[in-house]
């Protein structure tokens, strides 16, 4: 499997977001975990009131967003849940794509142990359905921590590979950004229509 190259990530953020759907995230730690991206949200940087970098806020936390596309940006919500973002666009254009949900592809027991401490077939139906259908959940299941912040998808132990398949993309409002005034209405959340791993339809 070949990693996506830098040029994939340095394009328009909306296009990157839509094109990430169906691609495979690979995390290599003790084992190799593969998850198909089924839901994303685009964040348009300086002019997007929902983005951490809105108004050109360059801080210790957001400085990785100012790198060229293809770097990992991990932040925490509620002081405990990690969220995986893919930096997009050109250098000094602080935009990113939030990975909201993935479908486990390989070594699903490892996903399950990371998330619940037991094998997948020991989980309840509810737990199986909720294993990776949200940004914090997928980070727990794939063991993506703050240590991943700043890693390079083009050379480090987390990367994304191409995957050819056809599906219908749904565009909708982003989730949990009611504070963002007009930006809360942007249709910048994209997901694979028939995926059962999408967080919310």
Curated annotation (Swiss-Prot):
CDD domains with a match to the protein in the record: AAG
One of the record's GO molecular function terms: alkylbase DNA N-glycosylase activity
Official protein name in the record: Putative 3-methyladenine DNA glycosylase
Species the sequence originates in: Clostridium novyi (strain NT)
Principal EC category: hydrolase
Family statement: Belongs to the DNA glycosylase MPG family.
InterPro entries for the chain: Formyl_transferase-like_C_sf, MPG, MPG_sf
GO BP terms in the entry: base-excision repair
The protein's Enzyme Commission number: 3.2.2.-
């Amino acid at each position: 499997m070949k990693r996506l190259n830098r040029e994939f990530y340095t394009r328009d953020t909306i296009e990157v977001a839509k094109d990430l759907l169906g691609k495979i995230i690979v995390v290599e730690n003790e084992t190799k975990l593969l998850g198909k991206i089924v839901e994303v949200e685009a964040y348009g940087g300086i002019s997007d009131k929902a983005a951490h970098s809105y108004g050109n806020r360059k801080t210790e936390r957001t400085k990785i967003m100012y790198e060229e596309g293809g770097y990992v940006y991990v932040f925490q919500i509620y002081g405990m849940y990690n969220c995986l973002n893919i930096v997009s666009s050109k250098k000094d254009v602080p935009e990113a794509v939030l990975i909201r949900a993935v479908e486990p592809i390989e070594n699903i027991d490892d996903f399950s142990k990371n998330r619940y401490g037991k094998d997948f077939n020991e989980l309840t139906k509810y737990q199986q359905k909720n294993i990776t259908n949200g940004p914090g959940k997928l980070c727990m299941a794939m063991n993506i921590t703050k240590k991943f912040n700043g890693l390079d998808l083009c050379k480090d132990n987390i990367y994304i590979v191409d995957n050819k398949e056809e599906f219908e993309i749904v565009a909708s409002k982003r989730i949990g950004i009611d504070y963002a005034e007009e930006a809360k209405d942007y249709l910048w959340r994209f997901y694979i229509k028939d995926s059962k791993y999408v967080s919310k339809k």
